[in-house]
Swiss-Prot record:
Biological process (GO), any one: melanin metabolic process
Protein name, entry field: Scytalone dehydratase-like protein Arp1
Entry keyword Lyase: yes
InterPro entries, per the entry: NTF2-like_dom_sf, Scytalone_dehydratase, Scytalone_dh
Keywords: Lyase
Quaternary structure (record): Homotrimer. Each subunit contains an active site, located in the central part of the hydrophobic core of the monomer, which functions independently.
Gene, per the UniProt record: Arp1
Enzyme's top EC category: lyase
Binding site for substrate: 49, 130
Organism domain of life: Eukaryota
Function description: Scytalone dehydratase-like protein; part of the Pks2 gene cluster that mediates the formation of infectious structures (appressoria), enabling these fungi to kill insects faster. The product of the Pks2 gene cluster is different from the one of Pks1 and has still not been identified.
Active site, renumbered: 84, 109
EC number: 4.2.1.-
UniProt source species: Metarhizium guizhouense (strain ARSEF 977)
Amino acid sequence: MSQSLTSSVETDSKTGSSKAISFQDYLDLSALDWARLRAILAPTLYVDYTKIGKEKWDAMSADDFMAMVSNDDFLGDPCVKTQHLIGATYWERVSESKVIGHHQLRAAHQVYTSPDLKTVKLRGHSHATNEHYYVKSSGVWKFAGLKPEVRWNEYKFEEVFKGSYTQSEKQS
């Protein structure tokens, strides 16, 4: 299977899915490689955060999605480090060009006291399942949205995106 997301990705004939986009999706998100993440996004994404107490967007533009996830109030915060690990997965083929990936997920987060990343201020980890939506465009699978459902959180997960250095700076 090709690991390149800029060319056509080999797909499973039964599910129409691509493991490469799912793996790369999380690799890029955890590494905060914004350019690579942007390259695998569909033009429009379905983003449903209602089961975690947030909003739902039926048609969020890729640019708006990138602005949201890379913002200092979220994953773009230089004091927040994260790693998203995928566990068990199954694929649901909706059509020739649409697939839903059902993923078991653990997202580990650490917030540091400053951007030098020397002192950990707090930790917060989440255990969840996640529906990921994929669409095939010109023979290439693109990430087209997500719908997480948290099972439980560890430590101070609720404070991860509120407790960082940059958030303290904004409140001063």
